[in-house]
Amino acid sequence: MVERKKWSENFSEWFNEVIEEAGILDKRYPVKGMNVWLPYGLKIMKNIEKFIHEEMERTDHQEVLFPALIPETEFQKEAEHIAGFEGEVFWVTHAGHEPLDVRLVLRPTSETAMYSMFALWIRSHADLPFKVYQIVNVYRYETKHTRPLIRVREISRFFEAHTAHADFEDAERQIKEDLEIFDNLMKKLAIAYVISKRPEWDKFPGAYYSLGAEVVMPDGRTLQIGTMHNYKQNFAKAYNILYEKEDGTHDYVHQTTFGMSERLLAAVIAIHGDDRGMVLPPTIAPIQVVIVPIPKKGSEEEVYSYAREIEEELKLAGIRVHLDLRDKRPGWKFYDWELKGVPVRIEVGPRDAAEKTVVLARRDKLEKITVSREELVDKVRELFDDIMQYLYERAKEWLESHIKRVDTIEEAKELFNDRRGIVEIPWCGEEECGLKMEEELEAKMLGIPYPEESARVEGKKCPVCGREAKFIARFARTY
């Protein structure tokens, strides 16, 4: 039976234990907020990134790789941007013993690194749309409590796509494409999420508007796992990114960005997990099937031989399989592979070897079935599909049950006291009222549902000022 008691009641402790014991990260590195990726964790992350690369290829983004250091002179060009980031950047002030004439910033994000180069590369309307991406390390001096994968000082798997367009309409089309890419990726991870348009006071520094994608974690807090920003011409004007139009005149480009990080893995671990550990979607599991031989005395040769045959058959079928021949008891191995979230376990004993059958145990529901050797590959593939569907449906049900709509501050407070995730409240649209609600609820406004039409509301009053509400606003306690 699947238990999620510790997972929900003591999520922080559960998460830290799983990260460590399942071999995802080692957080004992001697710089706070910087962690060491372990082989198993890195393999999962690389499998997630494989889907990102595929989506980038499909949508004609080109991969680039920019330096990690940005001169202070470039960093300062967009005033709103630097004001938003100045307090959380790492500065390089010396080279050897000598102070630098121009200080360098370890990139917190790459707008200021990339856009001086965009100004050199983009010349004409024929160069547009211009679409690039990279997956790099970025650095932010987080002063809050750091937490592996969730809040770190070195985001080591930071995906950022940067695009330039001839006009606002084409930039808007890009945002729609980003949302489609994100949705495709979330389907591969079996994750349900919401998209919100950030309030003016919480949009990305330098953006015209920002969108954020959130999931609800087991403790009721939300985790931002993706962002899309439309910059209009704000950065293009600061970095002089001009192009020649078809009529021979010049104009500034319109720009967008799209970002994700290892928080994707944090969401997978948190949302699909249970008290036994991780439950990985087969799409990204480094090991999709683990074979555990269970020989009795005198039957070792037959059982191991049969297990190797099964391993070979699954490998030939393109399934990522591992045969566990460690000198440990079967129960210990079951515990270990359940902790690591391997989607399907195959148990092979003397009777299975004799009767040409196998026992399949699925990690998500902790259920077992016996199947014949002939139907093994088909059955395993069928199980993968079933697991993906079950994980997504469970994640969707979890998310939907943690979004509640109320009319008053008092009702919202009660829900937050009960750790109920996202609370939706009518809002007049005025910043003063939004900030007042944040203060009263001790929660953050995620924004309004996106697309904006779905956020409009009629016949409701703003609980702060009593005026007619224009939107539904989402609030949450966040990471």
Swiss-Prot record:
GO cellular component: aminoacyl-tRNA synthetase multienzyme complex; cytoplasm
UniProt keyword annotation of Aminoacyl-tRNA synthetase present: yes
Chief place where the protein resides: cytoplasm
GO biological process: prolyl-tRNA aminoacylation
Entry annotated with the keyword Thylakoid: no
This protein's UniProt keywords: Aminoacyl-tRNA synthetase, ATP-binding, Cytoplasm, Ligase, Nucleotide-binding, Protein biosynthesis
Catalytic activity: tRNA(Pro) + L-proline + ATP = L-prolyl-tRNA(Pro) + AMP + diphosphate
Compartments, as annotated in UniProt: Cytoplasm
SUPFAM superfamilies, alphabetized: C-terminal domain of ProRS, Class II aaRS ABD-related, Class II aaRS and biotin synthetases
Example of a GO MF term: proline-tRNA ligase activity
EC number: 6.1.1.15
InterPro entries: aa-tRNA-synt_IIb, aa-tRNA-synth_II, aa-tRNA-synth_II/BPL/LPL, Anticodon-bd, Anticodon-bd_dom_sf, Pro-tRNA-ligase_IIa, Pro-tRNA-ligase_IIa_arc-type, Pro-tRNA_ligase_II_C
Subunit structure: Homodimer.
UniProt record similarity statement: Belongs to the class-II aminoacyl-tRNA synthetase family. ProS type 3 subfamily.
Name of the protein in question: Proline--tRNA ligase
Organism of provenance: Pyrococcus furiosus (strain ATCC 43587 / DSM 3638 / JCM 8422 / Vc1)
Gene for this chain: proS
